[in-house]
Design a protein with these regions (language model features):
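Conserved SAM-binding loop of SAM-dependent methyltransferases across substrates and taxa
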Residues: 93-106
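A short glycine-rich, Lys/Arg-flanked "PGG" loop and its adjoining helix->strand segment in the class I
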Residues: 160-175
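Flexible, glycine-/basic-rich loop-and-beta segments that form/coincide
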Residues: 228-267
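Conserved class I S-adenosyl-L-methionine
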Residues: 83-92
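Conserved SAM-binding strand-loop segment of SAM-dependent methyltransferases
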Residues: 124-138
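A conserved beta-strand element that flanks and buttresses the S-adenosyl-L-methionine
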Residues: 148
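Short, glycine-/aromatic-enriched active-site segment of Class I SAM-dependent methyltransferases
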Residues: 178-201, 205-207, 212
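N-terminal juxtadomain amphipathic helix
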Residues: 1-66, 223
Length: 267
């Protein structure tokens, strides 16, 4: 049974930049209320149509210098994996894939699948194939040695369609590197500003383990990062080509004990 967890009233879309105070005051506002279910899946009550959120998307990853540094560091975590073909989902202006290419001594086939048309030319100029579409299993893509999605999965109301796409496009022995603001840290530190309309889900490990299992996937490794107020990086593989590691166990225990309603009351 879903229960209201955090209600922040109504809010405008955060990536709209207004020229005047009056424009801002007249902006359309949408409900900003979230629920939690028995599996600790937290999501917004209201999903804003993707066309309103992303067709004229103003945010550029490259202006976020801590994120650029984060991308450069990520290469050192994954370079030991097979990495001939890498697909980045929601790769924006190509910041992550550019960081990989600049540090790799091997030729890389790099593909950015992004719903916004705003970044096509910038990616193509960098030698990155750009697929202007939502990540889905109907796309014609080569099997990926690595799929990356950094600060993207929580933006996706169609989480199960996303997982079906991972299952199809990830090579048998490939690894999906998933990053998201870790919601346990969000509540521990009362970061209410993580709640906005682009973030439809607020992920914990508990519901993800169940979702991954449904699509034949499992967590094989975890790393915590400081970016975005506390990010969890999960390494995910096909169950058919990986062994259980217990990597998620400590997170499952911590989430079961935590008082999310008490923290929400203090936000």
């Amino acid at each position: 049974m879903d229960k209201t967890l955090l209600d922040l009233g109504t809010q405008p879309l955060v990536n709209n930049l207004f020229h005047t105070k009056q424009e801002a005051l007249n902006a359309t506002q949408y409900p900003m209320s979230s629920t939690i279910d028995n599996d600790l899946k937290i999501q917004l009550d209201t999903a804003i149509p993707s066309e309103e959120l992303y067709m004229k998307y103003l945010y550029h990853s490259a202006v976020n210098k801590p994120y650029v540094y984060h991308c450069q560091k990520m290469w050192h975590s994954i370079k030991h994996l097979k990495h001939n073909t890498i697909i980045d989902v929601g790769g924006n202006d190509g910041t992550l894939l550019k960081a990989f290419r600049s540090q790799s001594t091997d030729p890389l086939k790099l593909i950015n699948v992004d719903a916004s048309a705003s970044f096509r030319e910038e990616n193509l100029e960098a030698g990155i194939e750009y697929i202007n579409d939502y990540f889905n299993e109907d796309l014609e893509l080569p099997k990926a040695d690595i799929i990356t999605s950094t600060n993207v999965f929580q933006h996706t109301p169609g989480a199960e369609k996303f997982l079906a796409a991972v299952r199809k496009h990830l090579a048998d022995t490939g690894v999906w590197v998933l990053e998201f603001p870790y919601t346990l840290r969000t509540f521990e530190t009362l970061q209410f500003d993580q709640f906005y309309h682009e973030h439809y889900y607020y992920w914990l490990v508990t519901p993800l383990v169940k979702l991954f299992d449904k699509y034949g996937l499992r967590i094989i490794n975890t790393e915590e990062q400081t970016i975005h107020g506390g990010t969890l990086r999960l390494w995910i593989a096909h169950k058919s080509h990986s062994n259980p590691t217990g990597a998620a166990d400590e997170y499952l225990k911590a989430e079961k004990k935590f008082d999310f309603f008490g923290a929400a009351d203090r936000m």
